[in-house]
Amino acid sequence: MSNEQAHKRVIQGKVVTKAGDKSVTILVERRVTHPKYRKIVKRFKKYIVHDESNAVKVGDMIEAIECRPLSKRKSFSLHKVLSVGVEA
């Protein structure tokens, strides 16, 4: 079982919305080098994460792990809360 879990992607991001029940949206930032200009630029992507216990709030930094598809766009589940943020 631990061998299967080693291949699952782990993402870290900030909770930006908490709209539905047991679901949060996180914003993941990654830094890439521009192919032509060689400048480091930021790229952002939003992921829908399953939060079984409704524990996180907007502004929290969380870590999510890949799981089986739970809905059309939700295929990550909450792994742990890294830091608690201030809700805006």
UniProtKB/Swiss-Prot annotation:
**Any keyword Ribosomal protein?**
yes
Listed A to Z, the keywords are: Ribonucleoprotein, Ribosomal protein, RNA-binding, rRNA-binding
Which InterPro entries is this protein grouped with?
NA-bd_OB-fold (IPR012340), Ribosomal_uS17 (IPR000266), Ribosomal_uS17_bact/chlr (IPR019984), Ribosomal_uS17_CS (IPR019979)
For this record, an example GO cellular component is: cytosolic small ribosomal subunit
Provide a GO biological process annotation. translation
GO molecular function annotation: rRNA binding; structural constituent of ribosome
PROSITE patterns for the chain: RIBOSOMAL_S17 (PS00056)
Q: So what does this one do?
A: One of the primary rRNA binding proteins, it binds specifically to the 5'-end of 16S ribosomal RNA.
Q: Which family does it belong to?
A: Belongs to the universal ribosomal protein uS17 family.
Q: How does it assemble?
A: Part of the 30S ribosomal subunit.
List, alphabetically, the PANTHER family matched.
40S RIBOSOMAL PROTEIN S11 FAMILY MEMBER (PTHR10744), SMALL RIBOSOMAL SUBUNIT PROTEIN US17M (PTHR10744:SF1)
Q: What protein is this chain from?
A: Small ribosomal subunit protein uS17
